């Protein structure tokens, strides 16, 4: 399966030039046409009210993207949640719970004080958010409206954050944030299955704010064609902490040491590159599929590679770390890199959030058959 995924990725990136490859790519591009058309009709159906969408009685902030792979949604959600909690608000994240055994089912993952469901059931990202942001409530469910209703009944939040919500048009939002990777905002600019776009580029019109992620401080993305408010952010790796608990470690403390890194995230190469930019000497790396459910086979592979590479230290991501607790004794010392989001244009997003909180008044809970016009 991994080899097949790699092949299609090479096709989309133009790294395969044989006649069979060109034929396969032509087939993918042909298949993308009805897919893109269906997505346009779907969006039009929600916008016109033909397909019903529902509104929660508290403000909803959606954070999402239009491309496959990681654009930094989790650190962005964590930043927004921390900001709102700092303003004294009770915040609940609504997530699907990708990768968990209960994916799509209604679950209260965190009540803001306690983690009630583990990553095996709830998925890695909901549990990571619950642990990373003190006071954050997290609810999972395929139907985010129903998840929001459950949160209202049990947790009484003041505001919702819809995680990975750009395509979840069934739930109306009051602020629609679209994340674009500064390095390659629209991938190869083709829709699935011929490219990385989850829907046509025109979907950007639904966004209230475009947030470019993984920018460099000196970078200036081309914003003129967007005709949308936009701001920039960058990801910072701020040292690491032992998985087993203990004092944090600066990356400079690893200078000159043989290290290996492993990760099961959407963009493992970006994580490995980030470590090397911080001066970590990576002698080997191991990439698993996104949302990997770690078991004995995966842990054995990590340990074999550590031994073969004679690595003194192992480093992984926060997202992986939430799933490694059962294997701490086998793994020994593993360092967890701390990833934070730095907003280069923070006042613009803060102003939008503050305006939403000021204007956001409680609304009556609408019945599910209501079809309002704003999606």
Curated annotation (Swiss-Prot):
This enzyme's EC code(s): 2.7.1.130
Catalysed reactions, semicolon-separated: a lipid A disaccharide + ATP = a lipid IVA + ADP + H(+)
Pathway: Glycolipid biosynthesis; lipid IV(A) biosynthesis; lipid IV(A) from (3R)-3-hydroxytetradecanoyl-[acyl-carrier-protein] and UDP-N-acetyl-alpha-D-glucosamine: step 6/6
Homology family: Belongs to the LpxK family.
Function in brief: Transfers the gamma-phosphate of ATP to the 4'-position of a tetraacyldisaccharide 1-phosphate intermediate (termed DS-1-P) to form tetraacyldisaccharide 1,4'-bis-phosphate (lipid IVA).
Protein name: Tetraacyldisaccharide 4'-kinase
Gene: lpxK
Gene Ontology MF, one: ATP binding
Keyword terms of this UniProt record: ATP-binding, Kinase, Lipid A biosynthesis, Lipid biosynthesis, Lipid metabolism, Nucleotide-binding, Transferase
Domain of life of the organism encoding this protein: Bacteria
Keyword Nucleotide-binding: yes
């Amino acid at each position: 399966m991994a080899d097949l995924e790699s092949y299609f990725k090479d096709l989309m990136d133009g790294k395969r030039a044989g006649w069979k490859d060109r034929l396969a790519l032509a087939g993918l591009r042909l298949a993308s046409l009805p897919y893109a058309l269906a997505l346009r009709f779907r969006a039009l159906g929600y916008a016109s009210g033909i397909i019903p969408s529902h509104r929660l009685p508290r403000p909803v902030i959606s954070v999402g993207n239009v491309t496959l792979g990681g654009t930094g949604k989790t650190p962005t959600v964590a930043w927004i949640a921390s900001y709102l909690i700092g303003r004294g608000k009770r915040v609940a994240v609504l997530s699907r719970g990708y990768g968990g055994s209960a994916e799509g089912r209604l679950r209260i993952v965190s009540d803001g004080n306690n983690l009630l469901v583990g990553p095996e059931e709830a998925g890695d990202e909901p549990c990571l958010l619950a642990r990373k942001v003190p006071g954050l409530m997290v609810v999972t469910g395929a139907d985010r409206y129903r998840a929001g209703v459950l949160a209202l009944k049990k947790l009484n939040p003041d505001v919702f954050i819809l995680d990975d919500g750009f395509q979840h048009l069934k739930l109306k939002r009051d602020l629609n944030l679209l994340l674009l990777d500064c390095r390659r905002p629209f991938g190869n600019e083709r829709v699935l299955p011929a490219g990385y776009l989850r829907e046509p580029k025109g979907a950007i019109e639904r966004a209230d704010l475009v947030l470019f992620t993984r920018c460099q401080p000196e970078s200036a993305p081309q914003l003129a064609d967007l005709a949308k408010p936009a701001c920039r952010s960058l990801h910072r790796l701020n040292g690491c902490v032992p998985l087993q608990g203990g004092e944090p470690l600066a990356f400079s403390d690893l200078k000159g040491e043989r290290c290996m890194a492993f990760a099961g995230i959407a963009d493992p190469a970006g994580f490995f590159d980030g470590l090397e930019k911080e001066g970590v000497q990576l002698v080997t790396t191991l990439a698993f599929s996104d949302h990997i459910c770690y078991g004995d086979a995966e842990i054995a592979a990590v340990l074999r590679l550590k031994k073969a590479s004679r690595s003194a230290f192992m480093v992984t991501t926060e997202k992986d770390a939430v799933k490694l607790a059962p294997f701490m004794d086998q793994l020994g010392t593993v360092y967890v890199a701390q990833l934070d989001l730095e907003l280069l244009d923070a006042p613009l997003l803060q102003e939008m959030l503050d305006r939403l909180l000021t204007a956001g008044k409680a609304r009556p809970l609408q019945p599910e058959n209501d079809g309002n016009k704003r999606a």
